[in-house]
Every structure is written in structure tokens, then in C-alpha cells.
Amino acid sequence: VIGVPGVSITPPKEMGANGNGISNVMRLLPAMLAKIQSGDFDRFGILVDADYAGVNGGFVQRRQEIENILIPAGYARTPNDPLCPFGSRYTHAAQIDIHLGIFPDHASDGMLEDLLAQSVSNGHHSILQTYAQTCIAGLPSILFNQALHAKKAEIQTLLAWQAPPGIDCGIATKNGVFDTTKPHFSNFSKWLLKVYS
């Protein structure tokens, strides 16, 4: 999704759900726990957007929704690692650990695009980001949910202005649109590598 070498992220739709998004993650999670119990996975991580309190969740609600499935299945959240502030680890006496990462930073409301917006590289990419914000603010008609998708519109607009137009986040990261050394992106990358290496 965002180009961390050696890590493959599979959205719910590619796992048999009728779409992506949190509702499909929640529907798939019990089946994934059964696959973990059967030994189908060596490592398992869950990545979701927090979204926003009062709109479609928020960090606290999102973590609670997932823990409402994990904890009754025998998992317990371990203390956070101060060297890797993104993500939580859940242990089980007889199963592999499950790792949970909630965008944008595993503490705040928001989504992947909030992390990306905070990680845009300085220079011409940040100038284009500012211009994208201005364009979105000046739209004569808004057809998207501004409370939920303003950053998504900003990032998609920024990606539409790349060469080639509309590249995905992984290619944009490889092309330097996003600065992987900025704190939120760096913390997320450390978490992915910790979970999957």
C-alpha cells in the first residue's frame, strides 16, 4: 500500500469480503482468528483507520471494537513499546501474536491519508500539497463527506498531479512524494518491520 519493502498488505476485498473498510475487517476477523488457530499464518497484523469520533468511530472506539473480538478469544494487549509508538501487540498463551495498527498514528483520530499528509516531502511536493488544499477549499460544490474525507481528497489530488498522474501511494513513496523519515511515517515503518521481519 505505501511501499515498505518486504511487507505485503492485503485488503479485506482480496480476502473474500465484499469490499474494504472497517465493517469488512470486523466481519473477517473471527475467520482470521480461526485460521491463526489452524496455523495458517506465521505473523498477523491488522491495519485500520481510526476515522473520527462522532463521524465514524475514532481511535478509542476503533481499538475497542477490535479488542471486543480479540480479548474474548484469549488475547491480551501488552504494554506499548516506547521505541515503537505505532501499534499494539496482543499475546495469546497458545497462538501467534496479533499486532494492531490504527492510522494515522495509533493515538489520534484520522486515517492513512492524515499520516501521509504529515509526511509529504518538503519542496515542490509540499507546494503542490498546499495548492491541493487551496483547490479543495475553493470547490464550488462538495460531493464528499468533508468531515471524513478532506485529507483523502487532498492526498488523492496530490497524487493526481504526479508523473504519471494518479500513482498509488507505494509508487509515490518510492518516488519521494512522502518523506519516510518524518516521525509518523517512520514510526509506522518501524512497526511494520517489527511485525513482519
Report the location of each language-model feature.
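C-terminal accessory helical subdomains adjacent to catalytic cores in phosphodiester-
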Residues: 2-13, 23-197
